[in-house]
Amino acid sequence: MYAGTDDPWQLSTRWYEQRKYAITLALLPHRRYRHAFEPGCSIGALTELLAQRCDQVTAVDVADAALRTADARLRDAGLRGQVTLERSSLDDAWPPGPFDLLVLSEVAYYLETGTLAAVLRRECRGLRPGATVVAAHWRHAVADYPLTGDEAHAVIAQTPGLTPLGCYRDSDVVIEVFDNGDGQSVAAREEVPGAC
């Protein structure tokens, strides 16, 4: 896939992708995070943006070519020191955290329903208390993917201990945010008058 180009999905240049990243980041309930985990990081386009809001990011992908591009991108941005890049898959044992942010962006639909559910049950227990889980996925069916984005999000929403915090959905993408804490809104956390 990466033989002809280092950005086969045009993650760095396509407005659809840039807009999706902006919405994803805007939905995060905390200004900063200590340690994020991003499986399926690809060329590091979202990783670079996460590194600006996180003290540390651990990002993994199965493609060596994608990881090389992510490495160069993060070096160019001066962010490589706070990002750990590893070759791994979403369904492998996750690297040690603990993580207070889990980013599932365009990766969950690669797994079968049962496998995705088992991975999330196994690994989400190790997230820090009050951790955020954000998921962003293409909604249209793709022949090679076992799940659509909507189907993947239905599995994620059933993960024990996750509480929904917010959602953005249009005809192309679904982005949802969960936490494993009390489910308080941003306004409630900041004690905005009238917030519940």
How would you name each of these model-derived features?
Residues V107:
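Hydrophobic adenine-recognition pocket in adenosine-nucleotide-binding enzymes
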Residues M1-P39, I43-G97, L111-R125, A131-C196:
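Class I (Rossmann-like) S-adenosyl-L-methionine-dependent methyltransferase catalytic domain
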Residues V103:
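A conserved beta-strand element that flanks and buttresses the S-adenosyl-L-methionine
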